[in-house]
């Protein structure tokens, strides 16, 4: 099959678009003035579109972002400073009010400061307890008053309230539910936690368990009583002690222990309870009968003591 050879004009034929715009045509560059005019035209066109949309009730388009001027930045900064000053003044007023409230509620402490929430809780309980007392019209029960006062408070706050009311915080402990539970011990057991001669039950046991507990007897000094007075104590069942007492002993120059032939009349202005001695001019807090003195010669610091030579003489003889 014979074919017609390609002719050069047919191979180099250009399209209609290429015929219209020749390839050798240079690109025209726009000057800066022409660019500015084009931007202004675009801005005007956008503003007109926004006005048309506003008039038609359609959502407004966001226009071009405005540049922050120097005056606008100063105004924003001034508004922020004024808002901070208002917030600071409000917090100062709140703190002053809470400080005044801490001085009114019954747990003011100079060393420990209540938190804001604990102050508000205690103030609420205090107002509620006072309202119940006024509605009852009679003298309130201390335990019930403290129970209402410490409801929902933490243990440190409960300790502060107990210290302010001069109570023992162990008598009313706050559980996890916020309720206050009281122990069965009487009030004097918490004030005087040591056993005395008249108490037949160890300290810390409730009244319900005292019947089932075997009574105990505290330590007494009947043996020393017999060795000193050469006679058996009426309340003691121990045998008589006839042995010779050891040489005089000096305890730091304060107590001198020796054996006398005659009984010494003790001064009546010094009553001994437990381990405390009455100070001249002051009342003793713990008093016992004068007959239960210890068999020791107690010399105040103002009195003179025996010299060491006299003590050594009695020892060598």
From Swiss-Prot:
UniProt-annotated stretches for the region Disordered: 1-90, 297-317
Keyword set includes Transcription regulation: yes
Matches recorded under PROSITE patterns: BHLH
Skewed-composition ranges (Polar residues): 301-317
Organism, as annotated: Danio rerio (Zebrafish)
GO terms classed as biological process: axon development; positive regulation of transcription by RNA polymerase II; sensory organ development
Keywords: Developmental protein, Differentiation, DNA-binding, Neurogenesis, Nucleus, Transcription, Transcription regulation
Motif interval(s): Nuclear localization signal: 65-70
Protein name: Neurogenic differentiation factor 6-B
Positions of the bHLH domain: 78-130
GO molecular function list: DNA-binding transcription factor activity, RNA polymerase II-specific; E-box binding; protein dimerization activity
Compositionally biased tracts (Acidic residues): 37-56
């Amino acid at each position: 099959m014979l074919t017609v050879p390609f002719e050069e004009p047919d191979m180099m034929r250009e399209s209609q678009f290429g015929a219209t715009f020749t390839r050798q045509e240079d690109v025209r560059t726009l000057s800066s003035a022409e660019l500015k005019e084009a931007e202004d035209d675009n801005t005007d066109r956008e503003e007109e579109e926004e006005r048309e949309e506003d008039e038609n009730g359609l959502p407004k388009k966001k226009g071009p972002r405005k540049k922050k001027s120097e005056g606008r930045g100063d105004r924003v900064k001034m508004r922020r400073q004024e808002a901070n000053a208002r917030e600071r003044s409000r917090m100062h007023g709140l703190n002053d009010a809470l400080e005044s409230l801490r001085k009114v509620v019954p747990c003011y402490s100079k060393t420990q400061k209540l938190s804001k929430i604990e102050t508000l809780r205690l103030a609420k309980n205090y107002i509620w307890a006072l309202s119940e007392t006024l509605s009852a019209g009679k003298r309130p029960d201390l335990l019930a008053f403290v129970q209402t006062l410490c409801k929902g408070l933490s243990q440190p706050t409960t300790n502060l309230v107990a210290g302010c009311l001069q109570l023992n915080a162990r008598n009313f402990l706050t559980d996890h539910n916020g309720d206050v539970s009281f122990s069965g011990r009487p009030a004097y057991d918490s004030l005087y936690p040591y056993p005395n001669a008249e108490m037949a039950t160890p300290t810390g046991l409730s009244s319900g368990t005292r019947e089932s507990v075997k009574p105990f007897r505290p330590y007494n000094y009947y043996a020393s009583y017999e060795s000193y007075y050469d006679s058996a104590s009426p309340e003691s069942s121990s045998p008589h002690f006839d042995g010779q007492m050891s040489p005089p002993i000096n305890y730091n120059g304060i107590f001198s222990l020796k054996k006398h032939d005659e009984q010494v009349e003790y001064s009546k202005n010094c009553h001994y309870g437990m381990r405390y001695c009455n100070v001249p001019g002051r009342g003793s807090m713990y008093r016992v009968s004068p007959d239960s003195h210890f068999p020791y010669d107690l010399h105040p610091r103002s009195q003179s003591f025996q010299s060491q030579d006299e003590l050594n003489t009695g020892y060598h003889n």
